């Protein structure tokens, strides 16, 4: 109950857009604040909510009882990317969790994306299934932008680990599949300037990438749907934070499309979270990874995977793929797994 009240109250203030209407310096009385909100709310009720959330660090009051920012809530004014991620989580990260039980009743496997928690949250009234995560975002440009902005923040905090996650000196040509606008490719090629990298993603993303003025000459961009056959021949193929967005059946399709391009000696590189065995590693680390696993389920009907699950998924797709090693860079939440095609 305690955490539900904490999360639910902060979520409500975010969705009411209260932090957006509080000045970054100074304060604003409750009567004036409610007049700025798009959704009507009684000043006394809003005061009750804020006087609770201030105790957990979200918003605050001055000596006269007017509303002012706390360091946490000020992010919504001075850090748009992080704020977008928080707004996205308020809409999509929390609400689907209340549909987990109903989803299990409809789909005990947890693999059916149209009967997953988010799909049930977004479905038409009375329907037994709903849209997938990506279909929801396709019709919601505001949250689609928040999602991509949030991923940019997330990637910026993790991308520094990529250059040290693998011996890139052994790779001459690399295909970064689902590589977005090339931010990961840039980190690799800046550290290893001999590598030629092809970044593949959907047309909308590739178009944005090509418009950027800071493109490295060793990076080219190519439109590609990873559910279709891989058109490029290369030394290595890289899937970073891709497979955890998809269920086992879809991951099998993705890997098999890459397999069609593999030649002896080529490598498949996957960088994703790897679930530990219970009690393996620190409690904090395991909690973080298992929270991510449940998050993948609620949003995508997907999962984080253990090493055994990842190996089984990949090696069942192509018997030529021999597992080489797993390496987790210090401080990284994701691990690099490598296979060589024999």
Swiss-Prot record:
Enzyme class: transferase
GO biological process terms, semicolon-separated: fumitremorgin B biosynthetic process; methylation; verruculogen biosynthetic process
Gene3D superfamilies from the UniProt entry: Vaccinia Virus protein VP39, Winged helix-like DNA-binding domain superfamily/Winged helix DNA-binding domain
UniProt cross-references to InterPro entries, sorted A to Z: COMT-like, O_MeTrfase_dom, SAM-dependent_MTases_sf, WH-like_DNA-bd_sf, WH_DNA-bd_sf
Pfam families: Methyltransf_2
UniProt: S-adenosyl-L-methionine binding residues: 201
EC number: 2.1.1.293
GO molecular function: O-methyltransferase activity
Active site, per annotation: 244
Record keywords, A-Z: Methyltransferase, S-adenosyl-L-methionine, Transferase, Virulence
Catalytic activity: 6-hydroxytryprostatin B + S-adenosyl-L-methionine = tryprostatin A + S-adenosyl-L-homocysteine + H(+)
Function: 6-hydroxytryprostatin B O-methyltransferase; part of the gene cluster that mediates the biosynthesis of fumitremorgins, indole alkaloids that carry not only intriguing chemical structures, but also interesting biological and pharmacological activities. The biosynthesis of fumitremorgin-type alkaloids begins by condensation of the two amino acids L-tryptophan and L-proline to brevianamide F, catalyzed by the non-ribosomal peptide synthetase ftmA.
Family statement: Belongs to the class I-like SAM-binding methyltransferase superfamily. Cation-independent O-methyltransferase family.
Oligomer status and interactors: Homodimer.
PANTHER family: O-METHYLTRANSFERASE ASQN-RELATED (PTHR43712:SF5), PUTATIVE (AFU_ORTHOLOGUE AFUA_4G14580)-RELATED (PTHR43712)
Protein name: 6-hydroxytryprostatin B O-methyltransferase
Organism the protein comes from: Aspergillus fumigatus (strain ATCC MYA-4609 / CBS 101355 / FGSC A1100 / Af293)
Organism placement in taxonomy: Eukaryota, Fungi, Dikarya, Ascomycota, Pezizomycotina
Primary gene name: ftmMT
